A protein has these predicted regions:
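C-terminal beta-strand-rich structural cap/linker in extracellular carbohydrate-active enzymes
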Residues: 502-532
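Secretory targeting and sorting signals
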Residues: 1-35
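Active-site neighborhood of glycoside hydrolase catalytic domains
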Residues: 198-217, 227-339
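Lectin-like carbohydrate-binding module/patch detector with strong preference for beta-trefoil
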Residues: 15, 22, 529-625
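Carbohydrate-binding surface patches
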Residues: 439-481, 516
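Aromatic/acidic polysaccharide-binding cleft in carbohydrate-active enzymes
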Residues: 330-424, 437-441
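N-terminal catalytic cores of secreted or lumenal carbohydrate-active enzymes
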Residues: 37-219, 223, 262
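Structural recognition of the beta-strand scaffold that forms the well-ordered cores
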Residues: 52-60, 90-97, 101, 162-166, ...
């Protein structure tokens, strides 16, 4: 959580030319940002559809560590709010494998932050004793560890389609500082290099024990959390005892990350789990990309899925393209935030901020899944005078993390804010198995139903004025006579209010959404892809235009040149031919010069300049929206 190859590659663009490691991507022009207009038309385009969406999720970690021991009525209500169909309807859970400080270290982490590790230290062990643990010795494992977080595993396992385990820090005896809150220098590697194999065995062993004890199947294990940052440090007080940081965390630079991944692959096989490696849960796309670019091919090959956080948002499309080039699924595996100005359960600003962030992640990152950090937060931290004078809006659900076995829902109340409501506009209507599709509006996300007969558009109106939204269905091949669009609106006036279905006329339906609202438009009676929607189309020609220069790529007798629009020499045109059996966002293409019959490629050496060559070698090219 944030504190807060091939020897030849093709390159082309419709609107933007983009190069990516391992493949080149055809990138469709991005729609302009929506201003505070009184009317907007939204066009969902199923010609560009992604792989099946895996769902919505949460990390367990702190809130589960605290509330797993709460009175039954409290924890059951929480579970319903998170996982029931009327709640957030989450179907993905990430279990936190705790590191754990030494037995003689007094707890100094935030409420819930001290997730118990799976090790069992010999009696009398202190922080100075670091060489005793042996992954092969059953006596060094604690099969009853972490009972509170594991209560949640049993409670929700019938609701969960995908399990992931992850680590915030190695156990104290594998760290350089001797504490799980980070090193004394937050920029230095915290895991001892000599402990990489032990760390891998610890994570794999805990994952396999979790599976066996609870009867679940873990899909992936991510050994890192925001590793290449300077967030994680331990501070000692005047008495030499730790006083901060307040959560588990460990800096691991790219080289150490690679060492851990190399060690983890055989450790997983040896443990008996079928879990694969995911990585690296970096804090934002830009840092993720730097880490990933440093990984050699054999390390990348060991990573089954790419995980990124979006606490920073620049570079979303870079990571999207890296995942496509690598042929790997991508998750937005963690984010949270405030998006308000002081704790307020009725203010729409936090809900609108979260909703726009979700739209941007879905549109730009194109993830297979979207996962909350902690939808349940500590009310004591978030109330005015807690972590800040005004308080805050982290989490969609807040309750005190200080409740006791004697408390009830009256004395330990559960509160929800507007983020809980606007999130459900997504989680209720874009479902696992649906496919996210292109949409030409930056305030909207869209998906087609798993069966291909229906769609959903989620639109965010963050302005203080109502807005007329026209849903244009002309990109679908078939729009039935009985097609309808049903708005489901969350605003200050109500939560998920379902309005009467609107009949589709001329392939369009119009509805006026309230100010400061999130609306799910549920579309029935549509299917297929209109012939004029598909890009590229057979026998059509396209310009290749630099996104920064605005100039066109042109083939001449002497090679390739870049010309300004309207320059002498005619209008440069190219043809794009789809190949292979894939469809939608993973379809591969070859780009040819229709006049000369040659294909566009990139030099394998030197300056990697684009060149024309005879159309023969297998292309490696993908389109992105």
């Amino acid at each position: 959580m944030a504190r807060r190859t091939r020897t030849r590659r093709l390159v082309a663009a419709v609107g933007i030319t983009a190069l990516a490691t391992g493949a080149a991507l055809i990138t469709v022009p991005q729609p302009a940002a929506v201003a505070a207009t009184a009317a907007v038309t939204v066009r969902p385009d199923p010609s560009y559809r992604q792989e099946k969406f895996e769902g919505w999720g949460t990390s367990l970690a702190w809130f589960a560590n605290v509330t797993g021991g709460y009175p039954e009525e409290i924890r059951q209500k929480l579970a319903r709010l998170l996982f029931d169909d009327d709640g957030l309807a989450l179907n993905i859970a990430r279990y936190n494998i705790g590191g754990g400080n030494a037995p003689d270290v007094k707890d100094y982490l935030r409420a819930g932050g001290a997730v118990e590790g799976w090790w069992r230290a010999p009696e009398g062990t202190t922080r100075e004793d670091t060489g005793w643990w042996d992954a092969k010795d059953p006596a060094d494992w604690n099969p009853r560890a972490d009972a509170t977080q594991r209560w949640w595993v049993d409670r929700i396992k019938n609701d969960i389609d995908h399990w992931e385990t992850f680590s915030n820090s190695p156990p104290w005896f594998m760290t350089r500082s001797g504490y799980v809150s980070g090193g004394f220098d937050a920029a230095q590697d915290q895991l001892k290099a000599a402990s990489a194999d032990d760390f891998a065995a610890y994570l794999a062993g805990a994952t396999r024990r979790l599976e066996k004890e609870h009867g679940i199947k873990v899909d992936t294990l991510d050994p890192f959390n925001e590793p290449n940052t300077t967030y994680w440090s331990t501070r000692l007080g005047s008495d030499g005892e730790p006083v901060g940081g307040r959560q588990e965390g460990a800096h691991m630079g790219p080289e150490l990350q690679q060492r851990v991944i190399r060690a983890l692959a055989p450790a997983l096989r040896a443990s008996g789990t079928r879990a694969k490696i995911s990585a690296m849960d970096e804090t934002n796309p830009e840092v993720f990309a730097r880490n990933w670019h440093s990984y050699p091919a054999e390390v990348r090959a060991l990573v089954d899925r790419m995980n990124v956080h979006t606490y920073g948002t620049a570079g979303r499309t870079t990571v999207r393209d890296l995942a496509k080039a690598a042929g790997k699924p991508l998750w937005m595996s963690e984010v949270e935030g405030d998006w308000g100005d002081g704790q307020d359960f009725a203010d729409m600003s936090p809900g609108l901020g979260l909703a726009q962030h979700m739209v941007d992640d879905l549109r730009e990152l194109e993830p297979r899944a979207w996962v909350f950090w902690q939808p349940v937060e500590d009310y004591d931290n978030m109330k005015p005078g807690g972590e800040s004078a005004k308080g805050g809006n982290w989490g969609s659900i807040q309750l005190p993390f200080s409740c006791t076995a004697e408390d009830t829902l009256d004395t330990c109340p559960i509160r929800t804010n507007t983020k809980f409501d606007t999130a459900r506009n997504f989680t209720h209507y874009i479902k696992p198995g649906d496919r996210l599709i292109k949409v030409d509006d930056t305030s909207s996300a869209a998906a087609v139903a798993e069966n291909g007969r229906g769609a959903t558009v989620v639109h965010v109106n963050s302005t203080t004025a109502e807005r007329t939204v026209t849903v244009d269905l002309s990109k679908f091949a078939r729009v039935s006579r009985g097609a309808t669009v049903t708005p489901v609106v969350t605003s200050a006036g109500g939560k998920l209010e379902r309005h009467p279905a609107i009949g589709v006329t001329g392939r369009k339906a119009t509805f006026t959404v309230p100010a400061e609202s999130v609306t799910s438009f549920v579309v029935t009676g549509v299917s297929g892809v209109a012939e004029d929607a598909a890009v590229p189309r057979k026998d059509a020609t396209y310009r290749l235009t630099g996104v920064h220069s605005g100039k066109h790529l042109t083939a001449t007798e002497t090679g390739l040149v870049v010309k300004s629009a309207g320059a002498p020499g005619g209008t440069p045109r190219w043809q794009l031919r789809g190949i292979g059996g894939a469809t939608g966002s993973t379809r591969r293409h070859v780009i040819t010069d229709p006049a000369g019959g040659k294909r566009l490629t990139v030099r394998a050496t030197g300056n990697h300049a684009p060149v024309l060559e005879p159309d023969r070698a297998a292309p490696d090219q993908l389109r992105s929206a």
